[in-house]
Curated annotation (Swiss-Prot):
E.C. number(s) listed in UniProt: 2.5.1.72
Protein name: Quinolinate synthase
Keyword field contains Methyltransferase: no
Known function: Catalyzes the condensation of iminoaspartate with dihydroxyacetone phosphate to form quinolinate.
Reactions listed under catalytic activity: iminosuccinate + dihydroxyacetone phosphate = quinolinate + phosphate + 2 H2O + H(+)
The keyword Magnesium is assigned to this record: no
Species in which this protein is naturally found: Pseudomonas putida (strain GB-1)
Residue positions binding [4Fe-4S] cluster: 114, 201, 298
GO MF annotation, one: quinolinate synthetase A activity
A GO BP entry: 'de novo' NAD biosynthetic process from L-aspartate
Lineage, highest ranks first: Bacteria, Pseudomonadati, Pseudomonadota, Gammaproteobacteria, Pseudomonadales
Cofactor remark: Binds 1 [4Fe-4S] cluster per subunit.
Length: 352
């Protein structure tokens, strides 16, 4: 990690702290005020699984959406609301704006970014792509609008395997960016010819196989759930590997009563909601930076607070804008992803 991104991480972590935690009464007041503003402004709140539980609960109770980044994009595009509040990180807000440029897209804070986005500047990535013009460019959704505009395909972790497999079946070779661990996992699963960008998620990269094996010894009957942004040695210990939505599904379907979960702890809200009779344990990390990386929670996701949600609704200042010149280029790979996954859904339902 560069010194610049490390400093940004520290600042994000500090900004996320709430010096005066809300009382139950204050929290209820914020939730009521936000619900009223959403209704008055014909707005909808979409939240990622990694947001704090109170934000996820608020999205659910106000008719919004709690999901992975793929379903967030689909929900925001299809919902009739004039304004979409995206509780997540900046690339999610940009994606919503690209798909529905006619809508107003707000975020609780525009400072909520992503280490994968920061680690893939468009100038450097474009130069890398230009060196291999014969390859199909596939980028993870955790990238800027400018990087998406340079890509042929955008994927999320829930559909990346299937899309890469389809491209491989067509004889295409691939440039993959920016998450090296997810790229390596896909490469290993599919056998695709892929050149990998050297990026990583600051949360998932902190999971360590030795500590995970030690924890497994403490919980011998537990199943290990791992997000594929984790290092290869961690993935090798998993009983199930997948996106956030896929890990939640695994928690529901596997017979185990205890799960060791190697992803952001924000996902525990939905897992515990759907599986109240099961126990979920945070996988150990080994963070040693200036910020609190030893606890598995994205500091930028933590910046989505009730106060900021209400503030962005009342002031409208944290609005997402995307360069109009980028939108026609960026929407093509995004729509390819949405069309591909929709076709896969229809095929699956037809075979049911």
């Amino acid at each position: 990690m560069t010194q610049i991104s490390e400093r940004l991480l520290v600042q994000a972590h500090l900004d996320a702290k709430q010096p005066n935690p809300l009382t139950a009464e204050q929290e209820a007041e914020y939730r009521a005020a936000i619900a009223a503003e959403l209704k008055a402004q014909n707005a909808v709140l979409v939240a990622h699984y990694y947001c704090d539980p109170v934000i996820q609960a608020l999205a659910e109770e106000t008719g919004g959406c709690v999901s992975d980044s793929l379903e967030m994009a689909r929900f925001g595009k299809n919902h009739p609301a004039e304004t979409v509040i995206v509780a997540g990180v900046r690339f999610m807000g940009e994606t919503a704006k690209i798909l529905t440029p006619e809508k107003r897209v707000l975020m609780p804070t525009l400072e909520a970014t992503c280490s994968l986005d920061l680690g893939c500047p468009v100038e450097e990535f474009s130069a890398f792509c230009d060196q291999h013009p014969e390859r199909t460019v596939v980028v993870y959704a955790n990238t800027s609008a400018a990087v998406k505009a340079r890509a042929d395909w955008v994927v999320t972790s829930s559909c990346a395997l299937e899309i890469v497999e389809s491209l491989m079946d067509n004889g295409e070779t691939i440039i993959w960016g920016p998450d090296q661990h997810l790229g390596r996992y896909i490469q290993k699963q599919t056998g695709a010819d892929m050149l990998l960008w050297d990026g990583a998620c600051i949360v998932h990269e902190e999971f360590k196989s030795r500590q995970l094996a030690d924890m497994k010894a403490l919980y011998p009957d537990a199943a290990i759930l791992v997000h594929p942004e984790s290092p290869e040695a961690v993935i090798e210990l998993a009983d199930a590997v997948g996106s956030t939505s896929q890990l939640i599904k695994a928690a529901q379907t596997l017979p185990n009563k205890t799960f060791i979960v190697a992803t952001d702890r924000g996902i525990f809200y939905k897992m515990q909601q759907l599986c109240p009779d099961k126990e979920f344990v945070e996988a150990p990390t080994a963070g040693n930076g200036a910020a609190c990386r030893s606890c598995a929670h994205c500091p930028w996701m933590a910046m989505n607070t009730l106060e900021r949600v209400l503030d962005c609704l009342r002031k409208g200042g944290d609005e997402i804008f995307v360069d109009p010149a980028l939108v026609p280029k960026a929407i093509k790979p995004l729509n390819r992803m949405l069309d591909f996954t929709q076709a896969a859904r229809l095929k699956l339902s037809g075979n049911a």
